[in-house]
Swiss-Prot record:
<keyword id="KW-0539">Nucleus</keyword>
<dbReference type="Pfam" id="PF00096">
    <property type="entry name" value="zf-C2H2"/>
</dbReference>
<dbReference type="GO" id="GO:0008270">
    <property type="term" value="F:zinc ion binding"/>
</dbReference>
<dbReference type="GO" id="GO:0005737">
    <property type="term" value="C:cytoplasm"/>
</dbReference>
<dbReference type="GO" id="GO:0032481">
    <property type="term" value="P:positive regulation of type I interferon production"/>
</dbReference>
<keyword id="KW-0862">Zinc</keyword>
<dbReference type="Pfam" id="PF00651">
    <property type="entry name" value="BTB"/>
</dbReference>
<feature type="zinc finger region" description="C2H2-type 6">
    <location>
        <begin position="544"/>
        <end position="566"/>
    </location>
</feature>
<keyword id="KW-0832">Ubl conjugation</keyword>
<feature type="zinc finger region" description="C2H2-type 4">
    <location>
        <begin position="487"/>
        <end position="509"/>
    </location>
</feature>
<dbReference type="GO" id="GO:0016567">
    <property type="term" value="P:protein ubiquitination"/>
</dbReference>
<comment type="function">
    <text>Probable transcription factor. Probable substrate-recognition component of an E3 ubiquitin-protein ligase complex which mediates the ubiquitination and subsequent proteasomal degradation of target proteins. Inhibits neurogenesis.</text>
</comment>
<keyword id="KW-0597">Phosphoprotein</keyword>
<comment type="pathway">
    <text>Protein modification; protein ubiquitination.</text>
</comment>
<feature type="compositionally biased region" description="Basic and acidic residues">
    <location>
        <begin position="270"/>
        <end position="279"/>
    </location>
</feature>
<feature type="region of interest" description="Disordered">
    <location>
        <begin position="130"/>
        <end position="167"/>
    </location>
</feature>
<feature type="region of interest" description="Disordered">
    <location>
        <begin position="248"/>
        <end position="289"/>
    </location>
</feature>
């Protein structure tokens, strides 16, 4: 048989994919060729960025930074270990109660197939639970408390985008309270976070605000309007919004599904929908799945006999727990209308949300352009609202402090001050890379991704700083030329507003002591040093003592910085890679690793370095050249103090009138 006449021959190894994954997992476990470290709750996981990027779209975006260390703060080490096993072996073993965390992680990391698998299992669990509930109700039997609590936990229902197609998103607050008669929502309605003022969705949001305010007032003042009928003129549907599990819990009675169907029927007639559009039996849609396997315990006030007060207390909680079937029947949505964008407000947050619901729509995430999955942004958004609602008792009484703007009650003064910044628009979170400021840490974290979105950076040819846009580079170049050149100390890099301030600062390095204490006649190099010294005469000598070594200090801030030597505390953390530092200036120097900035330049060979110490080491490579050179006799000195001593040997008439000590430096600094 002549093989040369057969043309092309295809060779295939069917075991190659499995063998490749198996070998990669062996290398990961052995730490071989691992090029990325993922930090989760102080626990390090070594892996290969190629494997993670192929598994997760989110990792593919993050790894454009070319950093070796990343920190994840939205999942536990146990969950990430399961994610790693899934990425390297295509399988994982997990308990049923772990599916909630796995689904959440898969949503954020955008691991589509894992997300699909979790959803299918949860749909099966939900379908089984609903069948069991229907059988028990039809039998008329009484359930035990434990079984009822279990079903409460299993009926916590939400929904999100579950297909690979591009689809819009609508917040839980928008969808959960879009009552019939307020808005005729159709698939064409914009479901992005950036709402136009004329959109039907915006109208639904406005209606949500008025409903929330009435709920807030009835909760804070349960006696007001107690005689008002449940189906009043303001919100006729509020009394009918009850989930199946709430009906079971009330008065120990068990209502049949027909009761809910009758409510749905009346709602459908009110909204003008024909019978064929109401939901019928069938498998749960993809936007009606269990997203939490945790138990949810409702707090009921047995003393509230009035039905209005009970609805006010549990109204938001009820809406958070409603299934799509109930929403469809209540709102007149056709059964075949699968709104992929529906999301539910977390019930654990809604139960304690006694603040103004208007705060829920004050954050606009439309500007982040897909850097993070929308479901992650919404979860973080509701998490922020949950933090603002922390410290509020179910009866509305304050544990400590109350916001005078929206009425939110928070546990301490620090929390209330942080909360008030949302109302005042105070932007206290600054980006260390570009200086832009944000209202909260969530917006800052998402902004930081824009510095590593994979675009080719434009580099400053003088200091190496990197920019994404040409106009930003042009603005930066002004510090290198003309009268706008930054005024800074070439020795320590400290910036100043005026040349006079710089000259006063240089006296510190030159050893000039022109500030005298009037109490003890001691001299100091600067006014700041003198003021610090004066505290010893007015507030005791050294009242603050270190409990580790016994050293004493004049003020508490100095003692706090000293203690970090003993405790190893590193409070300054890099938002880019998670590395921590003890001192702020160490963090500022470290950021140059991410920006590529090298502001120190050697005058001899024009090589650049990121920090002063690296430049000093480099200068010594020039045939042992010292970093300081006398401008008069060209003699080298190994240190600044040696140069100052050397200059005293020259006659005053030999020194030019414009001479300054920084002219002896053999390097330039552009920061």
């Amino acid at each position: 048989m002549d093989l040369t006449k057969m043309g092309m021959i295809q060779l295939q190894n069917p075991n190659h994919p499995n063998a490749l994954l198996h070998k990669a997992n062996q290398m990961r476990l052995a730490g071989t060729l691992c090029d990325v470290v993922i930090m989760v709750d102080s626990q390090e996981f070594h892996a290969h960025r190629t494997v993670l990027a192929c598994t997760s779209k989110m990792f593919e975006i993050l790894f454009h930074r070319n950093s070796q260390h990343y920190t994840l703060d939205f999942l536990s080490p146990k969950t990430f270990q399961q994610i790693l096993e899934y990425a390297y072996t295509a399988t994982l073993q997990a308990k049923v109660e772990d599916l909630d965390d796995l689904l959440y992680a898969a949503e954020i990391l955008e691991i589509e197939y894992l997300e699909e698998q979790c959803l299918k299992i949860l749909e099966t669990i939900q379908s089984s639970d609903e069948n069991d509930t229907e059988v028990n109700m039809n039998d008329g039997g009484t359930e035990d408390d434990e079984e009822r609590k279990g079903r409460h936990g299993r009926n916590l229902v939400g929904s999100k985008k579950h297909s690979t197609e591009e689809s819009g998103y609508v917040s839980a607050a928008q969808q959960a309270l879009a009552l019939p008669g307020m808005v005729d929502q159709s698939p064409s309605v914009s479901t992005s976070f950036g709402l136009s003022t004329m959109s039907p969705t915006k109208a639904a949001v406005d209606s949500l605000m008025s409903i929330g305010q009435s709920l807030l007032q009835s909760t804070m003042h349960p006696g007001v309007g107690a005689e008002q009928p449940l189906h009043g003129n303001s919100h006729p549907m509020m009394g009918e919004i009850k989930t199946e599990m709430m009906q079971v819990d009330e008065s120990g009675e068990h209502e049949s599904p027909k009761a809910m169907e009758s409510i749905a029927s009346s709602n459908g007639e009110r909204s003008g929908e024909p019978d064929k559009n109401r939901d019928g039996p069938g498998t749960p849609t993809r936007s009606s799945v269990i997203t939490s396997a945790r138990e949810l315990h409702y707090v009921r006030d047995e003393g509230l006999g009035d039905q209005q007060a009970e609805v006010s207390q549990m109204g938001l909680e009820a809406m958070a727990g409603m299934t799509e079937k109930h929403l469809a029947s209540l709102y007149g949505i056709p059964s075949n209308h699968k709104n992929e964008a529906m999301l539910s407000m977390p019930a654990s947050m809604a139960s304690s949300l006694h603040m103004s619901p208007a705060l829920a729509m004050s954050m606009d995430f439309s500007a982040y352009g897909g850097l993070l999955p929308q479901s992650f942004i919404q979860r973080e958004f509701f998490s922020k609202l949950g933090e603002l609602a922390a410290g509020i008792k179910p009866d509305g009484r304050s544990l400590n402090e109350r916001c005078n703007v929206c009425g939110a009650e928070l546990p301490d003064n620090e929390a209330i001050e942080q909360h008030r910044k949302l109302h005042s628009g105070m932007k206290t979170y600054g980006c260390e890379l570009c200086g832009k400021r944000f209202l909260d840490s969530l917006r800052l974290r998402m902004h930081l991704l824009s510095h590593s979105a994979g675009e080719k950076a434009i580099v400053c040819d003088q200091c190496g700083a990197q920019f994404q846009k040409e106009d930003a580079l042009e603005a930066h170049r002004q510090i290198h030329t003309g009268s706008d050149m930054a005024i800074f100390c070439l020795l320590c890099g400290k910036r100043f507003q005026t040349q006079t301030a710089l000259q006063q600062h240089m006296e510190v390095h030159a050893g000039v002591r022109s500030y005298i204490c009037s109490e003890c006649n001691r001299t100091f190099p600067s006014h700041t040093a003198l003021k610090r010294h004066l505290r010893s005469h007015t507030a005791g000598d050294h009242p603050f003592e270190c409990e580790f070594c016994g050293s004493c200090f004049r003020d508490e801030s100095t003692l706090k910085g000293h203690k970090r030597i003993h405790t190893g505390e590193k409070p300054y953390e890099c938002n880019g890679c998670g590395k921590k530092f003890s001192l702020k200036h160490q963090l500022e120097t470290h950021y140059r690793v991410h920006t590529g900035e090298k502001p120190f330049e050697c005058k001899l060979c024009h090589q650049r370095s990121r920090d002063y110490s690296a430049m000093i080491k480099h200068l010594r490579t020039h045939n042992g050249a010292s970093p300081y050179q006398c401008t008069i006799c060209l003699e080298y000195c190994p240190s600044l103090s040696a140069m100052q001593k050397h200059m005293k040997g020259h006659k005053p008439e030999d020194i030019p009138p414009d001479w300054r000590i920084e002219k002896t430096y053999l390097y330039l600094c552009y920061v």
